[in-house]
Amino acid sequence: MAREFKRSDRVAQEIQKEIAVILQREVKDPRIGMVTVSDVEVSSDLSYAKIFVTFLFDHDETAIEQGMKGLEKASPYIRSLLGKAMRLRIVPEIRFIYDQSLVEGMRMSNLVTNVVREDEKKHVEESN
């Protein structure tokens, strides 16, 4: 019987939890602010990890840029803390990527909501 998850998937889940804790408790850079780790992708040999993040204030482009610069600057420190927290032979090289899927999802949801409202208005006007 085949295993349900690959090891890289399990490691990615654990990295996501650990990095979320590290960002919340250990990293004190004011540029980073309120950041959420939305997903982690780990290479099959566990040497690289892409960490997808979102920020609380997604509408402010400069805050996002500053937050990403802060994360990039802190990545060696975060990697060292990750190595201490996890028992891995090789701690993956981490790269932070801004996750726009949440913002795009909200934009699409707003578009659908607006279309539904306009459609309801047309039906109300037609019935009168």
UniProtKB/Swiss-Prot annotation:
Cellular component terms (Gene Ontology):
cytosol
Family that this chain belongs to:
Belongs to the RbfA family.
One GO-annotated biological process of the protein: maturation of SSU-rRNA
Domain of life here?
Answer: Bacteria
| Protein name per Swiss-Prot or TrEMBL | Ribosome-binding factor A
Places the protein is found: Cytoplasm
What gene is it encoded by?
rbfA
- The protein's organism comes out as Haemophilus influenzae (strain PittEE)
Subunit record text: Monomer. Binds 30S ribosomal subunits, but not 50S ribosomal subunits or 70S ribosomes.
Chief place of localization: cytoplasm
Pfam families reported for this sequence: RBFA
> Which HAMAP family would you find in this protein's record?
RbfA
Annotated PROSITE patterns: RBFA
Q: What is the purpose of this protein?
A: One of several proteins that assist in the late maturation steps of the functional core of the 30S ribosomal subunit. Associates with free 30S ribosomal subunits (but not with 30S subunits that are part of 70S ribosomes or polysomes). Required for efficient processing of 16S rRNA. May interact with the 5'-terminal helix region of 16S rRNA.
Question: What InterPro entries does this protein's entry cite?
Answer: KH_dom-like_a/b, RbfA, RbfA_dom_sf, Ribosome-bd_factorA_CS
Keywords attached to this entry: Cytoplasm, Ribosome biogenesis
Q: Which GO terms describe its molecular function?
A: ribosomal small subunit binding
